[in-house]
């Protein structure tokens, strides 16, 4: 395996398909530009997929799970046992993302990268790639070893390759891990060079005292590791989580393999920011599903010059916001591909 595989070139966008799609939009039976962003989405997807009429009928959803050592600092109201329990809930169909995946007819891949209290035997349908019983507490040292960080990145890459081999049209990454908003907030604060208080939110429902404690924990982590903020791979190792690293690896691999990625909420967007810092060329392959309720999400999206599709006040994670946005992409593609042209419908075109 190439040690720095994430630096490999991203697949270039197909400018011929882009031009053909743009010309098709001009010929459809509607005032030009009247479908707003849906038109631009269809044209961009055409460039990504290399075809005049893109399709998003086979989405692939991968959920990466991993626990965080910083949970012992009381930054989440939930115990770490919940991570493994939710993996079982995903597998048995009871979680929000399970419902949405069924609705979409999407493949739902579940990957346990390292839970503090893993379920034995692993629930049917859960792929186990054990990197450790969660990360270390980043107030005491780096969250991950070098080996763990590289293996987590590779786990995301390998998921994308499975999706590509299965003929997926779109890749969605999701996450599960108690205390992972603390990790994401610390990473965002370091990468954006912004204060923790501006980025840290309540996560899964902290009260005011819990939020203050979480801010203080992130500030201590930045004091310990912040000198490495300009080194994205090292700051990921020091402040990140297995699932965040896997998501970053997945987004990098999507660009290299030529598979469009739809980025979910705050944690996934932080992983996307890391991916772009590691290899800026991957940015073209990232679509952003929604703007969530976590205060740091808006700032991360701004740093990525991202224009999210939805704004519903979501803060669940699991890839749920991205799954909710898939029908919008499908509609953009169907309108683009199935509407009649002025010539086909024998309708006069005002521009001709």
Swiss-Prot record:
Catalytic activity: 5,6-dimethylbenzimidazole + nicotinate beta-D-ribonucleotide = alpha-ribazole 5'-phosphate + nicotinate + H(+)
Single Gene Ontology BP annotation: cobalamin biosynthetic process
InterPro entries: Nict_dMeBzImd_PRibTrfase, Nict_dMeBzImd_PRibTrfase_bact, Nict_dMeBzImd_PRibTrfase_N, Nict_dMeBzImd_PRibTrfase_sf
Pathway entry: Nucleoside biosynthesis; alpha-ribazole biosynthesis; alpha-ribazole from 5,6-dimethylbenzimidazole: step 1/2
Group of enzyme by EC: transferase
Function: Catalyzes the synthesis of alpha-ribazole-5'-phosphate from nicotinate mononucleotide (NAMN) and 5,6-dimethylbenzimidazole (DMB).
The protein's name: Nicotinate-nucleotide--dimethylbenzimidazole phosphoribosyltransferase
């Amino acid at each position: 395996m190439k040690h720095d595989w994430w630096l490999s070139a991203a697949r270039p966008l197909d400018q011929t398909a882009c031009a053909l799609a743009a010309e098709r939009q001009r010929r459809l039976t509607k005032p030009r530009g009247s479908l707003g962003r849906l038109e631009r989405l269809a044209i961009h997807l055409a460039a990504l997929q290399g075809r005049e009429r893109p399709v998003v009928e086979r989405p692939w959803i991968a959920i990466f799970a991993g626990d965080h050592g910083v949970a012992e600092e009381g930054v989440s109201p939930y115990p770490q046992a919940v991570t493994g329990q939710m993996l079982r809930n995903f597998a048995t169909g009871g979680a929000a993302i399970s419902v949405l995946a069924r609705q979409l007819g999407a493949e739902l891949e579940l990957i346990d990268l390292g839970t503090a209290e893993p379920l034995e035997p692993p629930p049917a349908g859960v792929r186990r790639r054990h990197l450790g019983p969660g990360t270390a507490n980043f107030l005491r040292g780096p969250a991950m070893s070098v080996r763990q960080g590289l293996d987590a990145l590779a786990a995301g890459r390998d998921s994308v390759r499975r999706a590509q081999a299965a003929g997926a049209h779109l890749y969605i990454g999701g996450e599960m891990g108690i205390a992972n908003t603390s990790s994401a907030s610390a990473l965002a604060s370091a990468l954006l060079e912004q204060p923790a208080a501006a980025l840290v939110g309540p996560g899964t429902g902290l009260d005011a005292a819990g939020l203050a404690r979480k801010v203080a924990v992130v500030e201590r982590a930045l004091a310990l590791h912040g000198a490495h903020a300009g080194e994205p791979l090292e700051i990921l190792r020091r402040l990140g989580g297995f699932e965040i690293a896997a998501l970053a690896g997945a987004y990098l691999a999507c660009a290299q393999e030529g598979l469009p990625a739809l980025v979910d909420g705050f944690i996934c967007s932080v992983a996307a920011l890391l991916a772009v810092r590691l290899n800026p060329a991957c940015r073209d392959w990232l679509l952003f599903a929604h703007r969530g309720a976590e205060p740091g999400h808006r700032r991360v999206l701004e740093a990525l010059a991202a224009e999210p599709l939805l704004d519903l006040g979501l803060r669940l994670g699991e890839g749920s916001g991205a799954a909710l946005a898939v029908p919008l992409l499908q509609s953009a593609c169907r309108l683009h591909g199935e509407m009649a042209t002025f010539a086909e419908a024998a309708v006069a075109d005002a521009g001709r």
